[in-house]
Curated annotation (Swiss-Prot):
It comes from Acidithiobacillus ferrooxidans (strain ATCC 23270 / DSM 14882 / CIP 104768 / NCIMB 8455). Disulfide bonds: none annotated. This is Nitrogenase-stabilizing/protective protein NifW. Keywords: Nitrogen fixation. Belongs to the NifW family. GO terms for biological process: nitrogen fixation. Pfam families: NifW. May protect the nitrogenase Fe-Mo protein from oxidative damage.
Length: 110
């Protein structure tokens, strides 16, 4: 594993990635959307396919491009509109719990 890949593997927050890759960002946008930005970044990376053949310079350029795009997606839009997580893809009103199930659960003490 290259030094860049090791460093990237040690990063955990959106802010860590943005700072490491020298991408300017608005703290308010990141604070509200950090998980969405990272999920979108992951999705973009997944679409790229295998990046094992890339050297550190090419890999860093790819990460900067994809993370910048992920961040910009939430500068110009919002989490509900972008629908990054599965919960946003569920149809309105489809997920529900019947009163009967609530009553049964209450009787069982759950």
């Amino acid at each position: 594993m290259s030094d860049l890949r090791k460093t990237l593997a040690s990063l955990s927050s959106a802010e860590d990635f943005l700072k490491f890759l020298n991408i300017e960002y608005d703290e308010t946008v990141v604070h509200i959307n950090r998980l969405h930005i990272l999920k979108r970044f992951h999705d973009y990376l997944k679409r790229e396919g295998n990046t094992d053949a890339l050297d550190d310079r090419a890999l860093q350029a790819l990460y900067v491009k994809l993370l910048s795009q992920s961040y910009q997606d939430f500068v110009v839009s919002d989490a509900v509109s972008e629908k990054v997580f599965k919960v946003f893809h569920q149809a309105m009103g489809v997920s529900h719990v019947s009163l009967e199930k609530v009553a049964v659960s209450a009787r069982k003490g759950r």
